[in-house]
Design a protein with these regions (language model features):
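Sequence/structural signature of beta-propeller domains
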Residues: 1-311
Length: 311
């Protein structure tokens, strides 16, 4: 049985993590520099928010950060931006950040604080990494993110052994979604390393789609993936992936209603039944007679689709 709830204050939650054992989740919107804390048990406005513009230090705060992925590792959340160009195809340094925040949760609330300093050279590392040379990321980085073969990084997940997995919405080389393992995120944000350690972790057949979100389910030792088109086409599907380089991803049947999922959080695991909440990109929906992104902040909202998948 599925249900839909609404959260206020933003038109999307392009990156989010649930804080284990609690009803809280922390979400970023791709358009601003604010992390918002929501309570799943009482959907509505954020219970708290944290402003990050002074920490991320964009050259122009009017430029969007395009935060797209989040991964919880212990009491730290890693966040990654798209590392792509803007919608006009212009390079924007505000979209080139890997950063971390500390997080602690109690029944009363959530505390979030920046950790270390943002790493700004991940795009250079991706372009130069010998293991990634076949995917021509240098050429991809020169294209608009929603062009065929552009560059758009949207998924981030923890991996057993301490790595993070980066999931690419674009490019989709030879029709397969690209997953790259980042081996030293902690050293990068704590300024103990100057270059990312990168290797190919997966080339997934997602029906020609890229990765919009990826989430690790430790109880099941499996990843759940929201797959979608590299452009605005409404073509979404959920997959389960065991996580090995040669493992195949398996499609899951979920009725997405009219949601446009770009993030998911796992809320409960009961055997093979995994309870998830899919967070919808509702920037194009109407709010107060205007497109959500153009509406007054208090009118903005995004939806969560709560459902169960069998893996």
């Amino acid at each position: 049985v599925s249900s839909i709830v609404s959260y206020l204050g933003a038109c999307d939650a392009s990156a989010a993590v649930r804080l284990g054992g609690t009803a809280w989740f922390v979400a970023a919107c791709d358009e601003d520099y604010i992390l918002r804390v929501y309570d799943r048990s009482a959907p509505g406005p954020p219970a708290a928010s944290v402003e990050l513009v002074d920490f991320l230090k964009p050259e122009d705060p009017e430029h969007e950060p395009d935060i797209e992925g989040a991964a919880l590792v212990g009491e730290r959340i890693y966040w990654v931006t798209s590392h792509g160009r803007d919608g006009d195809g212009d390079e924007q340094e505000s979209r080139q950040r890997l950063f971390a925040t500390s997080v602690s949760a109690t029944a009363r609330g959530v505390r979030i604080a920046p950790v270390g300093r943002p790493y700004t050279r991940l795009l250079k590392d991706l372009v130069r990494a010998p293991a990634l040379e076949p995917f021509e990321l240098r050429r991809a980085a020169q294209r608009s993110p929603q062009e065929p073969g552009g560059l758009n990084l949207e998924g981030l997940a923890p991996a057993p052994g301490g790595s993070l997995l980066l999931g690419f919405r674009n490019p989709i080389p030879e029709g397969r979604a690209l997953v790259v393992a980042l081996g030293n995120a902690d050293d990068l944000v704590e300024d103990r390393a100057s270059t990312a350690r990168l290797r190919v972790a997966g080339r997934l057949d997602l029906g020609g789609r890229g990765i919009r979100a990826i989430e690790y389910v430790p109880e099941s030792k499996i990843y759940l993936i929201v797959a979608g088109a590299f452009d605005d086409a409404r073509d979404f599907r959920l997959y389960a992936w065991p996580g090995g380089l040669h493992d195949a991803a398996v499609g899951l049947d979920v009725d997405l209603d009219d949601c446009k999922p770009e993030e998911l959080i796992v809320t409960e695991v009961r055997g093979r039944r995994v309870h998830v909440e899919l967070l919808s990109d509702d920037g194009g929906r109407k709010a107060g007679g205007k497109k959500c992104k153009k509406a007054d902040p208090e009118m903005r909202s995004f939806r969560g689709l709560r459902t169960v998948v069998e893996i």
